[in-house]
Amino acid sequence: SALTVGALALSGCGATNSGNGESGGSDVGSDNVNTKWADCTPGHGSKDTTSMKADGKKDITIGAFNGWDESFATAGIMKNVLEKDGYKVTIKGFDAGPGYAGLVAGDIVLLTDGWLPVTHADYVKRYGDKMENLGCWYDNAKLTIAVNKDSKARTIGDLKTMGDEYDNTLYGIEAGAGLTKATKDSAIPKYGLKNLNFKISSTPAMLAQLKKSTSAGQDIANRSQRGQGLN
């Protein structure tokens, strides 16, 4: 099964990684994060809001994750819909950890881009009792290792013997991301990639390196998430 991408709101709102051949991993699990937050069908539970009572608070802030195009795109859709209903909406960018912290602190009222059950599992375990799950809007996202299209590697396993082609480096995102943990604990040992320097930074930093390397005609391997604009 694939991981889901959904929306989380401020409320009074361990999975394991299993490989799918050498093309990437899907996310499955039986713990609370998976069953409560990630097991859903896009659009399920949607309701007509035209008859609902208007909220008294009209100035709201929606959070989006820096470097995640789909995060800003879905936040923009929500902004457009809410402003038609008379709200004044601001979209504010965060890295994932500060974004979840800002949600539970009340600095923002909505995140549209929770990746579960792996990538954001630690944040949901930490803050879940203070958030509300508003459902998911995508259910076929994948955690992957990506390379530039014109490079030689065609499977994750190829990187075991082709590390020199990629400066023996695998670029990652935030240290606290479930994707980072899955890379260290699952992907690297499974595919024998201990010869690669797993460089942990942030999503914006990884994207900057991706742009720098490809612009210079250099091959690059990076941890990625299929379903995001960065792919």
Predicted regions, residues:
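Sec-dependent bacterial lipoprotein signal peptides
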Residues: 1-11
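Bacterial lipoprotein signal-peptidase II cleavage site
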Residues: 10-30, 40
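Short, well-ordered beta-strand elements
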Residues: 31, 37-40, 55-70, 87-92, ...
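Extracytoplasmic small-molecule ligand-binding "clamshell" domains
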Residues: 60-63, 68-113
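Pocket-flanking alpha-helical
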Residues: 75, 95-129, 205-213, 229-231
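Ligand-binding cleft/hinge of the Venus flytrap
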Residues: 78-85, 163-196
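Ligand-binding pocket segment of bilobal, Venus flytrap-like solute-binding proteins
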Residues: 108-112, 182-231
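A conserved helix-loop-strand patch within extracytoplasmic ligand-binding domains
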Residues: 129-176
